[in-house]
């Protein structure tokens, strides 16, 4: 993607503000596809017709979580098991006015405009319908690097109502359009083209989602570390950076991004390998003489301690760690790597040798503009209490665990 000249985010925001289409390209490690995206309040029947004729995908309308609540739009399913967790709500049509069946270009445009109209009430929308609202995650692409969040972020950055309309771009032969074809589409229709990774980098460059506290010395059994606390502005959660040694700009640093685990890190629980991994990471950094541990306050893969204990109870009753989360209405993994990425940037880390067995973590950090030059395994020996848990992580979550057969 870097070899092809894309448009800048600044250029894209200006066009978006004027009601023009953008082509937004996903990352190669994700769907690797492009969508036509436009601000919801700028939609017309003619523009909807263009999207359906030239996009050929599924017409959707990304809106915020708050807007979904205001319009009482429930999710299509309680447990979203789609590959990338695409957040579809129940489908809708605008009721009344000149709208009829909901399927015409006029009706679809009116429905999308209604979603972006603060005066629209839940009773103004028929369910089911012909428009697929998508619930964008709070904090946008800094929380989830998807087209849904990109549409809402672009609207906000353009000073418009935070809602959009999008459709996947499919080739005439029915295959998904990839970057070379998308470049040709952009040229044909004189539409600017950007990638989500650049939008993430723009937001990280222009916004601060964390603030740091005072730096202190922390003597440990693995030598001295510098400890810097960070507070996440969006929710007040506090995180920690442990730093050893000095490093140069762009130097590949040994890094562990570790989500908090009170049971394992503090009490030495044998139901997981978290505590052992944390101590092994500290030992390796001490041995190397330099490195960073980002300790994220994301207990239970992001669901919190109370919910984690409910999941533990379900595991005692026979469910595995993934199904326990899904049973409780959570995703298998709800961790937010955007905050970790900004903490790393704040302390000067842009390239790293990442200590992790989780390929999703690598993809998650790289999505925020960081470079993982090497993935360093940090595998520990399983015990009778965590072997099934680790087997589940290997088989259902893609963790690279050679000690698990």
Swiss-Prot record:
Note the InterPro entries from the entry.
DHBP_synth_RibB-like_a/b_dom, DHBP_synthase_RibB, GTP_cyclohydro_II, RibA, RibA-like_sf, Riboflavin_synth_RibBA
Enzyme Commission number(s) of this protein = 4.1.99.12, 3.5.4.25
Positions bound to GTP: 256-260, 277, 299-301, 321, 356, 361
Q: What does the record give as the active site? A: 333 (proton acceptor), 335 (nucleophile)
- State where D-ribulose 5-phosphate binds: 30-31, 35, 144-148, 168
Instruction: Identify the pathway.
Output: Cofactor biosynthesis; riboflavin biosynthesis; 2-hydroxy-3-oxobutyl phosphate from D-ribulose 5-phosphate: step 1/1; Cofactor biosynthesis; riboflavin biosynthesis; 5-amino-6-(D-ribitylamino)uracil from GTP: step 1/4
Q: Which reaction does it catalyse?
A: D-ribulose 5-phosphate = (2S)-2-hydroxy-3-oxobutyl phosphate + formate + H(+); GTP + 4 H2O = 2,5-diamino-6-hydroxy-4-(5-phosphoribosylamino)-pyrimidine + formate + 2 phosphate + 3 H(+)
Cofactor: record remark: Binds 2 divalent metal cations per subunit. Magnesium or manganese. Binds 1 zinc ion per subunit.
* Co-factor requirement: Mg(2+); Mn(2+); Zn(2+)
In chain numbering, the residues marked as site (Essential for DHBP synthase activity) are 130, 168
Q: Entry's PANTHER family?
A: 3,4-DIHYDROXY-2-BUTANONE 4-PHOSPHATE SYNTHASE, GTP CYCLOHYDROLASE II-RELATED
* Assigned protein family: In the N-terminal section; belongs to the DHBP synthase family.
Protein name per its UniProtKB record: Riboflavin biosynthesis protein RibBA
């Amino acid at each position: 993607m870097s070899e092809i000249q894309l448009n800048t985010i600044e250029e894209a925001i200006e066009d978006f503000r004027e009601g023009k289409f953008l082509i937004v390209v996903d990352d190669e490690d994700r769907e690797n596809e492009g969508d036509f995206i436009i601000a919801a309040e700028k939609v017309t029947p003619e523009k909807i017709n263009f999207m359906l004729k030239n996009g050929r995908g599924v017409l959707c309308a990304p809106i915020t979580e708050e807007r979904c609540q205001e319009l009482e739009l429930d999710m299509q399913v309680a447990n979203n098991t789609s590959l990338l967790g695409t957040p579809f709500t129940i489908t809708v049509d605008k009721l009344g006015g000149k709208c009829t069946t909901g399927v015409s270009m006029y009706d679809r445009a009116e429905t999308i405009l209604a979603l972006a109209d603060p005066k629209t009430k839940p009773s103004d929308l028929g369910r089911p319908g012909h428009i697929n609202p998508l619930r964008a995650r709070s904090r946008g692409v800094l929380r989830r690097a998807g087209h849904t969040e990109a549409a809402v972020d672009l609207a906000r950055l353009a000073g418009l109502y935070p809602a959009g309309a999008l459709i996947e771009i499919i080739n005439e032969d029915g295959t998904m359009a990839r970057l070379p074809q998308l470049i040709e589409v952009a040229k044909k229709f004189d539409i600017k083209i950007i990638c989500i990774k650049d939008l993430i980098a723009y937001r990280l460059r222009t916004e601060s989602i964390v603030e740091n506290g005072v730096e202190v010395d922390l003597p440990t059994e693995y030598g001295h570390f510098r400890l810097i606390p960070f507070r996440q502005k969006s929710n007040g959660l506090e995180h920690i950076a442990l730093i050893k040694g000095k490093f140069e700009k762009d130097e590949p640093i040994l890094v562990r991004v570790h989500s908090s685990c009170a049971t394992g890190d503090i009490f030495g629980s044998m139901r997981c390998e978290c505590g052992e991994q944390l101590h092994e990471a500290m030992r390796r950094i001490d041995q190397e003489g330099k490195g960073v541990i980002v300790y994220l306050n994301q207990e239970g893969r992001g669901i919190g301690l109370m919910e984690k204990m409910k999941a533990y109870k379900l595991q005692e009753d026979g469910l595995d760690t993934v199904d326990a989360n899904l049973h409780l209405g959570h995703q298998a993994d709800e961790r937010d790597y955007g905050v970790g990425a900004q903490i790393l940037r704040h302390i000067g880390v842009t390239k790293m040798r990442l200590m992790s067995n989780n390929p999703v973590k690598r993809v998650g950090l790289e999505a925020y503009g960081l470079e993982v030059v090497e993935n360093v395994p940090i595998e520990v020996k399983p015990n009778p209490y965590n072997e099934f848990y680790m087997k589940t992580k290997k088989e259902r979550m893609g963790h690279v665990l050679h000690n698990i057969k």
